[in-house]
Structures are given as structure tokens and as C-alpha cells.
Amino acid sequence: MADLQTQMKQAVAAAAVEQIKDGMVLGLGSGSTAALMIQALGAKLASGELRDIVGVTTSFQGEVMAAELGIPLRNLTAVDRIDLAIDGADEVDPSFQLIKGGGACHVQEKLVASRADRFVVVVDSTKIVDRLNLGFLLPVEVLPGAWRQVQGRLAELGGIADLRMAQCKAGPVVTDQGNLVLDVSMAGGIGDPEDLECRINNLPGVLENGLFVNLTDEVLVGQISDGVAGVRRLQRRE
């Protein structure tokens, strides 16, 4: 039997797939919960429950998985619009602001989310927080030759930034764009995500950061109630 966290992720992934309609162009997110969603989508396509779906993936991992499941794919540049994007998050605050980028895919994830007519976030209950960045570091993608300079500028903004090192290779993590990632902890967490997103992205050498501000339309949360996995739809706090 799957552990409780996996059960929550499976429940919320299944709920997200129920929002998909025939003929949609879909943004297919990254991470463990999004992977379960892609698997559920593949099963519905294989059974004929869904038809004429086109996927736009946000990572190499998602592209490989979707292709293996027979989900038709296109590049972001080949579609005029995305009807629905479904993705996970590392943290979600009460105003539906997010931190993403634990898998270093946040640049493509943000491109897809911002293109979508509707962006639905799927998480388990451990990802819901009152304030961002108290429990999860903020990823900032930087040009390889600029990481030291950006590290210093982030310190001026009150952040401690460490270069993300790879687990299965010597040296740092390298993104799909060929860049490096700084993981940032802001003193006291992030009180104004919109302001900080702009400040960081204005630093020379920064490509993008993992704050997703004013993009999310709905948050589906997997939770356990009386030992049974279910789904709760969050209400946004304005």
C-alpha cells in the first residue's frame, strides 16, 4: 500500500485530470505530483476516455514520461495558446503565491503557466504554508558566469544564497537552459512575493526565479481524513 503522502498525491492528481476535456492543449508540469497526473492522463487517453489532447511539457523528465505514455506533444513555440496547465508546487501561501523550482525546471514552468488560460496547482497538504520561504529555499536561475555576482546582490536584499550542487554528478546542478541555480533563504521568509520577484529578476545575470505570483487560478490539495485520501479546493485569501 502506498504511504499517506503518495495517497494524497494520487488523489489530487486524479482530481486534476477530471478537469481535462477533449481537444485541450495542456501544460504538463514537473515533479512527483505532476508525474502522477501525467500517468493518469495517459491512462485516460489509452482507454479512449479522452481524445485529441496535446501536451506541452515543462521538463525533460515530463517529456520522456509523456512520450512513453503516448501523449502527443508540441513545443511551447508551436502552440498559440494553452487551455489548461496543471503543475505542482513546493510551497503555496494563502494568496495562492508559490515557490517552485525544486527540480530546477521553474523557467519553463513559468513560461507555460503564464501562457495558460487556466493554471491549476496540485499539491499534498504538506506544501501549504502561511508564509513562503520559511521551509523551502527560493531557486534563482543564473548565468554560469554571474553566480558570484548575483550571490552578492542577493545578500544586499537580505538573502543567503548557496549554489545548488548536484547529487549524482560532481559539481553544480545545470538546468535545461544550461544555467546554474542559487537557492536563497530570505531573513524572516518572503513577506511581499510580488516585490521580491521583480527585484530579483532585475538583477543582472538572473534569468528567472521560482516565485510564481498572481498566476494561480485554483489549488487542489490532497489530504487524509479518517485514514482516507481526499481532495480539498483552497479558497484564495485576497
From Swiss-Prot:
Q: In which pathway does it act?
A: Carbohydrate degradation; pentose phosphate pathway; D-ribose 5-phosphate from D-ribulose 5-phosphate (non-oxidative stage): step 1/1
Please list the reactions this protein catalyses: aldehydo-D-ribose 5-phosphate = D-ribulose 5-phosphate
Query: Mind listing the GO biological process terms from this record?
Result: D-ribose metabolic process; pentose-phosphate shunt, non-oxidative branch
Pfam families, alphabetized = Rib_5-P_isom_A
InterPro entries, per database record = NagB/RpiA_transferase-like, Ribose5P_isomerase_typA_subgr, Ribose5P_isomerase_type_A
GO terms under cellular component: cytosol
Active site, UniProt feature: 109
Q: Which CDD domains match?
A: RPI_A
Q: Which SUPFAM superfamilies match?
A: D-ribose-5-phosphate isomerase (RpiA), lid domain, NagB/RpiA/CoA transferase-like
Top-rank taxon, per record? Bacteria
Q: What is its EC number?
A: 5.3.1.6
Q: Give residues annotated as binding substrate.
A: 30-33, 87-90, 100-103, 127
GO molecular function terms attached to this record = ribose-5-phosphate isomerase activity
Q: Which UniProt keywords apply?
A: Isomerase
Q: Does the keyword Transport apply?
A: no
Primary role:
Catalyzes the reversible conversion of ribose-5-phosphate to ribulose 5-phosphate.
Q: Which family does it belong to?
A: Belongs to the ribose 5-phosphate isomerase family.
NCBIfam families in alphabetical order: PRK00702.1, rpiA
Could you describe the subunit structure of this protein?
Answer: Homodimer.
What protein am I looking at?
Answer: Ribose-5-phosphate isomerase A
| Organism of this sequence | Prochlorococcus marinus (strain MIT 9313)
